[in-house]
Amino acid sequence: MSAARESHPHGVKRSASPDDDLGSSNWEAADLGNEERKQKFLRLMGAGKKEHTGRLVIGDHKSTSHFRTGEEDKKINEELESQYQQSMDSKLSGRYRRHCGLGFSEVDDHDGEGDVAGDDDDDDSPDPESPDDSESDSESEKEESTEELQAAEHPDEVEDSKNKKDAKSNYKMMFVKSSGS
């Protein structure tokens, strides 16, 4: 250690040329065995130069390469656009927004006074939705259609069922109120 101090006295600048001492950054002088091991070491340390092996394309494999025709591309794009439009229409209309919060639900008025904003559809107009969307109808919509059929046959019974429905919703609301007041 004292020999190292004598060769490099404190406070004296060293020359820019490397001495016989090997620094920690001189990896190429390390004896790692054959050239392959040396390249692996340099690659793992992040100092190795990567050899360019050619163009690598993700998914470019014989088993996965399936090229679509222009017609298939158009068909897929049209389906995606129609699905997007349907979802945006239903989101903006608020038609399928049945739950407003924990324990709260939308009250449907059949008189036409409490229509949801943006829901200007008449009941007589056909829905622009595909037949696949008919499977996703909620139970409340099915109940409404059965009530409309009953209204044509027995108007007095429908009023009673509406009153019962309102009483049920009020009864549910009593349990939802906060217990702090």
Swiss-Prot record:
- Which ranges are annotated Acidic residues under compositional bias? 106-147
In its keyword annotation, does this UniProt entry include Zinc? no
Which residues are annotated as modified residue Phosphoserine in the UniProt record? 15, 17, 63, 87, 125, 145
Which Pfam family, any one, appears in the UniProt record? SMAP
What keyword terms does UniProt attach to this protein? Acetylation, Isopeptide bond, Phosphoprotein, Ubl conjugation
Bias kind Basic and acidic residues: ranges: 48-78, 151-169
Q: Where is this cross-link: Glycyl lysine isopeptide (Lys-Gly) (interchain with G-Cter in SUMO2)?
A: 13, 62, 75
Superkingdom to which the source organism belongs: Eukaryota
Chain positions with N6-acetyllysine modification: 172, 177
Q: Does the keyword Transmembrane apply?
A: no
What ranges does the record give for the region Disordered, renumbered to this chain? 1-181
Family membership:
Belongs to the SMAP family.
Q: Report the protein name in the record.
A: Small acidic protein
Biological source species: Bos taurus (Bovine)
